[in-house]
Amino acid sequence: MTKIIGLTGGIASGKSTVTKIIRESGFKVIDADQVVHKLQAKGGKLYQALLEWLGPEILDADGELDRPKLSQMIFANPDNMKTSARLQNSIIRQELACQRDQLKQTEEIFFVDIPLLIEEKYIKWFDEIWLVFVDKEKQLQRLMARNNYSREEAELRLSHQMPLTDKKSFASLIINNNGDLITLKEQILDALQRL
């Protein structure tokens, strides 16, 4: 029987680094963010849905989604956030389910990286849930450095996500990413060996 492990965390918690280590260890990982980017590409299902909802002002000069502008429009307004979630979640869920079902045919163990795994109620999809955990202050610092956000912008982004401390109770494994890369890699390799 196939074992499916959900990988989650928060913005700037280090999920991408963890995913890279898992892939380098020979495991397949479905990355929800990559799925979303494909769906938002010109002509994709999310592209069409967002264009119908918000109009052509969300496009750049090449007709692609202007992601910073789209993000600003959605995060600036709580009603837009709700509408965006409702609009996008069913399309994303369908595509993730399709990819999950395909991997079930070929893999004994695989991972699905979903940032909002708990919030969007994907829990029942998984045999285990691994949480990439980082302290809030470190998360803020990483987000400000990575995205060139002010502290206020970073705090606003974090305020729209479930705190990582609240996600701990859902996790089968907590990957502590407050240390260095070597320590992180050791934790992951140890967990993978126990599968």
Swiss-Prot record:
Pathway: Cofactor biosynthesis; coenzyme A biosynthesis; CoA from (R)-pantothenate: step 5/5. One of its GO terms (biological process) is coenzyme A biosynthetic process. Signal peptide: none annotated. ATP binds at A12, S13, G14, K15, S16, T17. The keyword Lipid biosynthesis does not apply. Its EC number is 2.7.1.24. It is found in: Cytoplasm. One of its GO terms (cellular component) is cytoplasm. It is an enzyme of class 2 (transferase). Keywords: ATP-binding, Coenzyme A biosynthesis, Cytoplasm, Kinase, Nucleotide-binding, Transferase. It catalyses: 3'-dephospho-CoA + ATP = ADP + CoA + H(+). Residues 4-195 form the DPCK domain. GO terms for molecular function: ATP binding; dephospho-CoA kinase activity. Its main location: cytoplasm. Catalyzes the phosphorylation of the 3'-hydroxyl group of dephosphocoenzyme A to form coenzyme A. Belongs to the CoaE family. This is Dephospho-CoA kinase. The gene is coaE.
